[in-house]
Design a protein with these regions (language model features):
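Anion (oxyanion) recognition and catalysis
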Residues: 11, 73, 190, 241, ...
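Short glycine-biased active-site loop of nucleotidyltransferases that positions the nucleotide triphosphate
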Residues: 27-33, 209-212
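C-terminal substrate-binding/cap subdomain adjacent to the FAD-binding core in PCMH-type
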Residues: 96, 115-269
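N-terminal glycine-rich flavin-associated loop
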Residues: 1-17, 35, 40-87, 99-132, ...
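Helix N-cap motif at beta-to-alpha junctions
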Residues: 1, 178-181, 222-229, 282-286, ...
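Conserved glycine-rich FAD pyrophosphate-binding loop
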Residues: 15, 22, 29-36, 41-42, ...
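Structural motif
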Residues: 15-18, 36-38, 55-57, 78-80, ...
Length: 377
């Protein structure tokens, strides 16, 4: 209610608001314009309801992702997302940026797991959409609309997610070698009956920097009962062996450290001048893209990934390649002067006018995160 009052005052005063959680993703998106007030949801940090038997969780927007996972672990459950900087990321920020990684291979994206939201409209009114049950049919599906909208449509205060049981055993197979063989291995795994939790293609520089081998990489994780994990890992290694790839298995602490370090290598650049980008291409073009990239990874099924560059010229070259392959490249984090010079979002598709109409409907005075989204929305 206090947050609603603040936004209502801002609406009447025509103050421009930049909503955030812990601020871990404020560098993402376009540069917001003429901000008057920054509103943080850090103190909205309560777990409201954990329905253990129903596998649902309702939390306030400022709860940290790591705190949620620690609470759920006591009941052998998980929220099946893997955002960047999980120790800092809040639920509101994860929804606003649609931030999850390769767990989408098995569990889907943020919007696929979001069941309901409570939010404050631009005029300060509190509203709700969805519910607290998995089979929810009430109202419009605003959850999908708000996911990835970068705080331009509302300020989320509460969210309800579906949960999943924690699996008893986990194991990872890593294949490295030539781009042709890695491409064939990815095609084989995509077309098989294997059920990986995570499966990513890695650039040669990323493979080398982590000491995982030489050439491009394919990393595949399975989580299930021990027998299933062992059998599926063996099948991946057999695929690699037939193609002349080097195969290694990881378990326990070694595996956990591997999956923790992987996103850190990309999202924690050594130089402030480096540029981090989100890309999407057709899965069959992923190896071609990674072969020309410096540091990066791409999910084998969705074709979504993260790349890091040292200069803007290479960003534009990669954007052209992605768009030629029916994809996109948008800049997440970069020096201010780079974002002032380049179009952060790139090709906006054919829905820009529709998006502007939605923005006008939800925020007619343009006070929420102005200019941060695609097309200056």
């Amino acid at each position: 209610e206090q947050l609603a009052e603040v936004i209502a005052v801002a609406y009447r005063s025509k103050w421009r608001i930049l909503p955030c959680g812990n601020g871990s993703k404020l560098k993402w998106g376009s540069l917001s314009k003429h901000i008057d007030v920054v509103v943080s949801t850090q103190r909205l940090n309560k777990i409201i309801n954990h329905a253990v038997g129903d596998l649902t969780l309702t939390v306030e927007a400022g709860v940290k992702f790591a705190d949620i996972q620690a609470t759920l672990a006591k009941h052998n459950q998980i929220l099946a997302l893997n955002p960047t900087t999980p120790d800092l990321a809040t639920i509101g920020g994860i929804i606003a940026t649609g931030d999850t990684g390769s767990l989408r291979q098995r569990y889907g994206s943020v919007r696929d797991q979001l069941l309901g939201v409570t939010f404050v409209r631009a005029d300060g009114q509190i509203a709700r959409a969805g519910g607290r049950v998995v089979k929810n049919v009430a109202g419009y599906d605003l959850m999908k609309l708000f996911t990835g909208s970068y705080g331009t449509l509302s300020v989320i205060t509460e969210a309800t997610f579906r949960l999943y049981p924690m699996q008893s055993t986990s194991g990872t197979a890593m294949l490295t070698g030539s781009k042709e063989a890695i491409s064939q291995a990815a095609d084989t795994i995509r077309g098989s009956a294997l059920t990986p939790t995570q499966a990513d293609l890695l650039s040669a520089q990323l493979v080398s920097s982590m000491g995982l081998g030489k050439g491009l990489g394919l990393i595949v994780r399975f989580e299930s009962i021990p027998e299933s994990v062992k059998e599926q890992l063996n099948q991946v290694l057999q695929v690699g062996e037939k193609l002349g790839l080097t195969g290694v298995q990881y378990f326990d602490t070694e595996e956990q450290n591997l999956w923790r370090l992987l996103p850190e290598q990309i999202h924690l650049p050594e130089q402030e001048s480096e540029i981090t980008c989100k890309i999407g291409v057709l899965p069959n073009a992923a190896v071609e893209v990674l072969d020309r990239a410096e540091l990066g990874l791409i999910n084998i099924s969705s074709g979504l990934g993260i790349l890091r560059f040292e200069d803007e010229k290479k960003v534009l070259e990669m954007r052209n390649l992605c768009e030629l392959r029916s994809g996109f490249l948008s800049i997440l984090s970069a020096p201010i002067e780079v974002k002032q010079k380049l179009d952060v979002w790139g090709y906006s598709g054919n829905g820009l006018e529709l998006m502007r109409g939605i923005k006008k409907q939800f925020d007619s005075e343009n006070i929420l995160s102005p200019g941060r989204f695609v097309g200056g929305i």
